[in-house]
Regions:
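Membrane-interface helix-loop junctions in multi-pass transport and translocation proteins
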Residues: 1-6, 60, 64, 72, ...
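Membrane-water interface segments that mark the loop-to-transmembrane alpha-helix transition
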Residues: 3-7, 11-60, 73-79, 102-103, ...
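Juxtamembrane helix-entry segments on the extracytoplasmic side of multipass membrane proteins
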Residues: 2-5, 67-75, 163-168
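Membrane-interfacial segments
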Residues: 30, 62-70, 126, 130, ...
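Interhelical loop/hinge segments that connect adjacent transmembrane helices in multipass membrane
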Residues: 102, 145-171
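Generic alpha-helical transmembrane segments of integral inner-membrane proteins
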Residues: 13, 17, 45-57, 83, ...
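Membrane-interface junctions at transmembrane-helix termini in multi-pass inner-membrane proteins
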Residues: 25-34, 84-107, 121, 130, ...
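Hydrophobic alpha-helix/TM-entry signal in multi-pass membrane transporters
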Residues: 40, 74, 90, 104-107, ...
Length: 171
């Protein structure tokens, strides 16, 4: 299970680049526009896809560096979490901005319980480290679905350079 620890380093660094402080900038800004939210959403999506592609392509190098052949596919599969989470950063940010921690907690509890049950069942069935991968991806997928269902914010077809510059200056 140390393999997951090795991957977590790369995932955590990538997550930092995906957000780039934009969530904090949106929370700080008093009157966020639809253009602000949509701009950050598309930036997060693009960064999630680009960083996943980098992880996917470098999975063999990472695997060779740690001398762990199984790491190649673990990185590629668990790296999908970057894309999934990039789709929900704005959803979580809008809930935080509205101070709706109750809904955030409900979503976290439901996704943790359901993914935890799956992870335990897979571990009992002998899936080993893949049970942790499935648990992590399942938690992100469930959380994403619930955030999109209950939050109802939808992106517009807007990417504003002005919004990007203003918000990036904070992050």
């Amino acid at each position: 299970f140390g393999l997951i620890g090795m991957i977590t380093i790369f995932i955590a660094i990538s997550q930092t680049f995906i957000n780039s402080g934009f969530s904090s900038a949106l929370i700080r800004k008093k009157d966020c526009t639809q253009a602000d939210y949509s701009t950050v959403f598309y930036y997060n999506m693009a960064m999630g896809i680009v960083l996943y592609a980098v992880l996917y392509l470098s999975a063999g190098v990472i695997s060779n560096f740690f001398d762990e052949p199984e790491l190649k596919w673990l990185v590629r599969v668990l790296g999908l979490d970057l894309i999934i989470r990039s789709l929900t950063l704005i959803q979580g940010t809008t809930l935080t901005k509205r101070v709706d921690f109750k809904l955030q907690t409900k979503i976290a509890v439901v996704s943790s319980i359901l993914s935890g049950v799956l992870g335990i069942l897979m571990a009992v069935e002998g899936f080993g480290v893949w049970s942790l991968v499935a648990r992590s991806l399942t938690a992100s997928i469930i959380s994403s679905i619930l955030l999109w269902f209950w939050n109802r914010w939808k992106p517009s077809a807007i990417f504003s350079r002005e919004s990007f510059k203003e918000l990036f200056g904070f992050g």
